[in-house]
């Protein structure tokens, strides 16, 4: 099981759904965790008698809402620490609990867990600094930028992060401004950024998908699809974008 963090203040729900869809097309089992304050997943995906925290399966993807950490999800799913009996009972109690917690999380029945985080607390609660990959997703309105930077200040140790940037015209000065705002953060930006269009046409497709309860990538613009497939390929760390593209169309 590999954790993948998606950090930022802008709406990332649809992006995570599409990335998860691309990963499942490659025969991977995926859990999408909505740890955000607004918990928009509650209102986007259909659920029967939803409780304060719950997990649902939708379009071959599992989605969780309302959990405070991955350990809570483990308890919800009945995942146990299979190696707990092998741990020295004389060990420090705190270390014992941490080892047990880590082992439980490792036993989650997924290839990838995509975690949507919009607060500094979420970084700590979900152990984002230990994630296999991390992405910072933002638009260039001042709220998303500055709130996003506040979230990044929750990172306590140097951490490699890939920028995922929504913008109409991809102006260089926008990305330079983000670099300026984040200069005191612990982030180490990866050399390659992902650029996603934010066109009226793409927004209409996303809204239509939500109305009909579908996760369809095909109708999105070619540029948006390429961004999704690039992220999926980066997470998979294997194969090629063309292979993912073919799997999505099947």
Predicted feature locations:
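P-loop/Walker-type NTP enzyme "switch/lid" segment
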Residues: 5-10, 31-111
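Conserved beta-strand segments of the P-loop GTPase G domain that flank and frequently precede/overlap
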Residues: 6-8, 33-34, 113-116, 134-140, ...
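Short, charged, surface-exposed secondary-structure boundary motifs
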Residues: 42, 143-153, 204-206
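Glycine-rich phosphate-binding loop used to anchor ATP phosphates in small-molecule kinases
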Residues: 104-124
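Inter-motif core of Ras-like GTPase G domains
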Residues: 120-141
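Beta-strand-loop-alpha "switch" segments that mediate conformational coupling across diverse proteins
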Residues: 168-222
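NTP-binding/hydrolysis catalytic cores, primarily Walker-type P-loop NTPases
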Residues: 206-250
């Amino acid at each position: 099981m590999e954790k993948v963090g998606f950090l930022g203040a802008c709406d990332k729900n649809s992006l995570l759904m599409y990335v998860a869809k691309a990963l499942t097309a490659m025969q991977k089992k995926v859990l999408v965790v909505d740890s955000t304050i607004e918990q928009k997943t509650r209102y986007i995906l259909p659920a029967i008698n939803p409780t304060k925290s719950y997990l649902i399966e939708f379009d071959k993807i599992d989605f969780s809402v309302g959990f405070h950490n991955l350990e809570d999800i483990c308890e919800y799913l009945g995942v146990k620490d299979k190696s707990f009996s092998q741990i020295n009972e004389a060990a420090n109690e705190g270390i014992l609990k941490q080892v047990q917690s880590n082992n439980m999380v490792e036993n989650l029945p997924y290839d990838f867990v995509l975690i949507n985080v919009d607060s500094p607390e979420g970084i700590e609660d979900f152990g984002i600094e230990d994630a296999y990959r991390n992405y910072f997703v933002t638009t260039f309105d001042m709220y998303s930028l500055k709130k996003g930077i506040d979230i990044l200040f929750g990172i306590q140790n140097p951490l490699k992060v890939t920028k995922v940037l929504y913008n109409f015209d991809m102006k260089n000065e926008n990305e330079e401004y983000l670099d300026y705002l984040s200069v005191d953060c612990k982030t180490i930006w990866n050399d390659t950024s992902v650029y996603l269009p934010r066109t009226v046409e793409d927004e209409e497709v996303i809204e239509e998908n939500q109305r009909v309860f579908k996760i369809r990538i095909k109708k999105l613009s070619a540029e948006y699809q390429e961004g999704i497939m690039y992220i999926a390929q980066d997470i998979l760390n294997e194969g090629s974008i063309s292979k993912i593209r073919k799997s999505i169309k099947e």
